[in-house]
């Protein structure tokens, strides 16, 4: 991993490695996932991982097969659509929390050894598009290269709590998470109404989309046909 850019993420899980420890298995399988911020950054790393699989097979004197079971593009943002949604978020205002919800959030932060900052439900100004937007993944990237996509993030957990943790599950499953979900749903619904009613807004969104796509010829990573979901346990 030290030979890739900091934006690259690589994960793996051995799905089948034999049955007993003292017998070399006749079959084994590993699931590897590679991520990067852009498709241009992802492709060479993916190709290198494929070469590594081939090299390992040569060293072990075995046959190997690589099955691509998923592949997504990066997200193509739309500033015009984002500005329309930002207006609706500001109309809705900050997410409001009860004292009971704030106390629950503080307790979660204490249990995780994090600063007791409570819940941040403020609506922030629309930022400039970042070249490196940070962590997280979305499966709407391919959609965004075919039609304009507008998305948002809403608070569903206390500030600073590790995202892949039981604390986020606990928070998302109660009123803190429900409020964030409903806030996001309202903003999405209001923005869709604006797009349906405002022909100029639709034209401006499409114009930006066409300019960003340019001459890019969308080509999905997966081969045509049904998705190979039988490869995933």
Locate the predicted segments by residue.
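Midchain, well-structured core segments that form catalytic/ion-binding scaffolds
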Residues: 1-109
């Amino acid at each position: 991993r030290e030979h890739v850019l900091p934006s690259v993420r690589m994960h793996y899980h051995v799905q089948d490695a034999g049955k007993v420890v003292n017998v070399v298995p006749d079959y084994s399988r590993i699931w590897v996932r590679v991520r990067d911020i852009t498709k241009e950054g992802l492709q060479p790393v993916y190709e290198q991982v494929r070469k590594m699989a081939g090299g390992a097979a040569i060293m072990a004197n075995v046959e190997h097969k690589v099955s691509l079971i998923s592949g997504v593009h990066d997200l193509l943002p739309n500033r015009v659509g984002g500005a329309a949604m930002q207006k609706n978020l500001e109309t809705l205002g900050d997410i409001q929390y009860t004292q009971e919800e704030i106390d629950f959030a503080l307790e979660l932060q204490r249990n995780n050894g994090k600063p007791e900052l409570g819940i941040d439900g403020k609506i922030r100004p629309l930022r400039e598009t970042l070249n490196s937007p940070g962590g997280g993944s979305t499966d709407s990237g391919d959609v965004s290269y075919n039609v304009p996509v507008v998305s948002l993030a809403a608070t569903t957990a206390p500030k600073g709590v590790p995202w892949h943790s039981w604390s986020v599950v606990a928070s998302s499953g109660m009123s803190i998470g429900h409020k964030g979900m409903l806030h996001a749903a309202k903003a999405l619904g209001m923005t869709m109404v604006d797009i349906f009613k405002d022909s100029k807004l639709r034209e401006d969104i499409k114009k930006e989309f066409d300019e960003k796509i340019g001459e890019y010829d969308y080509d999905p990573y997966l081969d045509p046909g049904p998705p190979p979901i039988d490869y995933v346990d």
